[in-house]
């Protein structure tokens, strides 16, 4: 079979045909015909003979490319040489330039595979030459579709924004001159438009791609990428529609977009699903993140594609090889973006970004992220020093500002001084004594290492506020709702920093509360996003707190929860996560509710369905010598049976032992209904400043106990 194919090829290549310079269209078709003829030939001896005896440099160049693919000329130098000769002989013909671009692209691949070649940009220079050759071909013939597609693919891989803008302009000209642009051309045109920043034009290109009958799943994803990056909710529908189509090429693209933030367990589940099940899985994946970050549904998906586009535009990895050293604290393996891009896609825009110039140090940056559980501090350094390193265009994560490339050659005080706005720890490193400074330096390194671990293994879209408010809050599960339990989110906002509006009745404070309860998989079991107006007869002083309460129906169980409080247009706070235990309804056994605690004038009142007034404190802080009102409920008791109540205040850490209570109160009560509602006052007169445990035990006639505990902190007046 190979011999017959080669013989036919010999006839084709040795037949007398006009010179390629005759007409551009005919030379292009002749080029493609020869290219198709040699594609299936693997006899290098006959191909080499044809190459030597061919008097047409373009045809010889096509054969040379095939020889290179078969390993007979691995660096494609023969093909490049023949195509260069063809560009000189047929200067007004586009086909030789197209062939030269193909050969140089092949040579670039060979250079990148050669591990003996040193440097971080191996093969990229040749790839740029390939792109230039394609551009020359388009300069001669703007309708040369194959050259336009090849140029776009090369420039997309180079990640050079300047080259992409030029490629965009050339593609626009080709699109305008080709009446019925093929699907492949529309696809790469849209991708180049998006990569060069013209996202709206890219969306139009993909709409044309879909309207013309291009691959539907791929077209829907590309259209969704554009709309989502622009923050448009209209991108949701094509995203999920495309995910439900079992197109291998499109599904690989979906997976690549997901892989930058998803752990292996999520990717494994994604790989196992098909059709609508895959689309439903993606919807749940993104919606879970919306709920976790207290965002409206769909916002996390749009933010993800905005970040991807921004990272690829601003933090591209314009090297072909990455060499790591001992001070590289993280090895992403990415070939698309540097470590700044990795962090940006996962964590978003930093609250503060420093890019100082320090004499002796390589280019570097530091980012700070505001987080409810503790800020993240991240340092990036490019270049190299005596400890190794990479490239000036490859920013790497390092644990400490003292690990920046060239830090040993830079003034230490200038390195530290340049980061003072990020954290007080840098002032301590600079100004404290020898041992204090060393301890702070060790702490700064630990913070850096922890920040790298958190930021490279998680993703976040936490709410950010221009002005951070001082606030305390608590979620107390007591009472009943249609879902089982009732959670009371009680909050107190420090008046300093709040805004108010005057009314005829006094002043009012607008407050927005966002709250989510999560299971152990961080999936929402209940959410709340509500606004309320708190009225006062006068504006609060700086030492006062704005207090309020909202209700969240909760199913029985132990849940973690996250909450954000916003007051006015720009002030707010995201609170650290906490947990709440919601008692069951008592159908199987007695169930003890949460413990509500409060002092008159320093708590929010709640009126129960039985008409009782309960005081709910927004925090666990109580002043010394306070009289604390305690309220709890026991559901599922037997009417007429006696129950023993024990309320105690204990020292922390020993509440399970036989220690003597610091404060104790016990009593018997006969249940008058299936629900016991108990309200008692506990005096804290004898307790000093510090932390304590308030414990409530309720025993049934058989001696079975229900126990609840709460931590309180006693402070001075």
What does each of the following model-derived ranges do?
Residues 56-58, 93, 144, 181-182, ...:
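Residue-level recognition of tetratricopeptide repeat
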């Amino acid at each position: 079979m190979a011999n017959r194919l080669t013989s036919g090829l010999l006839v084709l290549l040795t037949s007398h045909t006009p010179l390629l310079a005759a007409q551009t269209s005919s030379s292009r078709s002749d080029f493609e015909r020869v290219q198709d003829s040699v594609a299936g030939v693997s006899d290098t001896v006959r191909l080499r003979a044809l190459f030597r005896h061919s008097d047409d440099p373009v045809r010889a160049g096509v054969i040379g490319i095939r020889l290179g693919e078969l390993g007979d000329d691995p660096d494609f130098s023969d093909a490049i040489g023949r195509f260069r000769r063809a560009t000189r002989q047929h200067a007004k013909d586009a086909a030789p330039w197209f062939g030269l671009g193909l050969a140089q692209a092949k040579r670039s691949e060979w250079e990148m595979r050669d591990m003996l070649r040193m440097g971080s940009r191996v093969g990229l220079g040749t790839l740029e030459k390939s792109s230039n050759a394609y551009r020359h071909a388009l300069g001669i013939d703007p309708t040369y579709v194959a050259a336009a597609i090849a140029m776009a693919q090369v420039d997309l891989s180079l990640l050079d924004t300047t080259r992409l803008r030029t490629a965009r302009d050339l593609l626009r000209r080709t699109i305008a001159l080709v009446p019925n642009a093929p699907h492949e051309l529309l696809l790469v045109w849209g991708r180049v438009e998006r990569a060069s920043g013209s996202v709206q034009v890219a969306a139009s290109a993909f709409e044309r791609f879909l309207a013309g009958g291009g691959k539907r799943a791929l077209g829907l994803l590309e259209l969704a990428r554009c709309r989502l990056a622009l923050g448009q909710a209209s991108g949701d529908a094509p995203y999920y529609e495309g995910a439900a189509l079992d197109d291998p090429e499109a599904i690989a693209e979906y997976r690549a977009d997901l892989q930058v933030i998803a752990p292996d367990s999520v990717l494994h589940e994604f790989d196992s699903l098909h059709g609508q099940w895959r689309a439903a899985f993606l919807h749940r994946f993104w919606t879970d993140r919306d709920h976790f970050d207290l965002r409206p549904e769909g916002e996390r998906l749009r933010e993800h594609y905005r970040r991807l586009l921004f990272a690829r535009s601003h933090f591209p990895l314009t090297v072909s090889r990455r060499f790591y050293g001992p001070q590289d604290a993280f090895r992403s393996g990415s070939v698309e973006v540097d470590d700044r891009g990795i962090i940006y896609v996962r964590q978003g825009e930093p609250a503060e970004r420093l890019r100082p110039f320090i004499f002796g140090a390589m280019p570097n940056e530091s980012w700070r992220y505001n987080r409810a559980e503790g800020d993240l501090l991240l340092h990036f350094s490019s270049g190299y020093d005596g400890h190794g390193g990479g490239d000036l265009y490859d920013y790497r994560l390092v644990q400490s500002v003292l690990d920046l490339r060239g830090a040993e050659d830079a003034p230490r005080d200038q390195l530290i001084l340049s980061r003072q706005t990020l954290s007080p720890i840098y002032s301590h490193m600079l100004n404290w004594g020898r041992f204090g400074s060393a301890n702070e330096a060790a702490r700064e390194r630990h913070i850096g290492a922890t920040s790298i671990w958190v930021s490279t293994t998680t993703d976040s879209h936490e709410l950010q506020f221009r002005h951070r408010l001082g606030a305390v809050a608590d979620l107390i599960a007591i009472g009943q709702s249609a879902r089982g339990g009732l959670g009371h989110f009680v909050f107190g906002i420090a008046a300093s920093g709040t805004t108010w509006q005057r009314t005829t009745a006094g002043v009012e404070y607008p407050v927005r509360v966002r709250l989510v309860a999560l299971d152990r998989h961080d999936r929402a079991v209940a959410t709340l996003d509500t606004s309320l107006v708190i009225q006062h007869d006068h504006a609060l002083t700086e030492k006062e707190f704005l207090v309020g309460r909202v209700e969240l129906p909760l199913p029985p169980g132990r849940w973690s929860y996250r909450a954000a409080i916003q007051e006015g247009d720009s002030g707010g706070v995201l609170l650290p996560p906490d947990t709440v235990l919601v008692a069951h309804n008592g159908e199987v056994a007695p169930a003890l509710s949460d413990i509500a605690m409060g002092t008159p004038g320093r708590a929010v009142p709640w009126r129960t369905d039985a008409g009782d007034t309960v005081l709910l404190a927004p925090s666990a802080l109580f002043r010394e010598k306070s009289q604390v009102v305690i309220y709890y409920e026991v559901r599922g008791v037997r009417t007429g049976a006696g129950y023993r109540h024990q309320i105690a205040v204990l020292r922390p850490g020993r509440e399970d032992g036989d220690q003597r209570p610091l404060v104790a109160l016990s009593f018997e009560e006969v249940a008058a209904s299936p629900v016991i509602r108990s309200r008692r006052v506990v005096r804290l007169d004898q307790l000093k400043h510090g932390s304590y445990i308030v414990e409530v035990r309720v025993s049934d006639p058989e001696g079975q106990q229900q126990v609840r505990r709460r931590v309180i902190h006693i402070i001075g007046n």
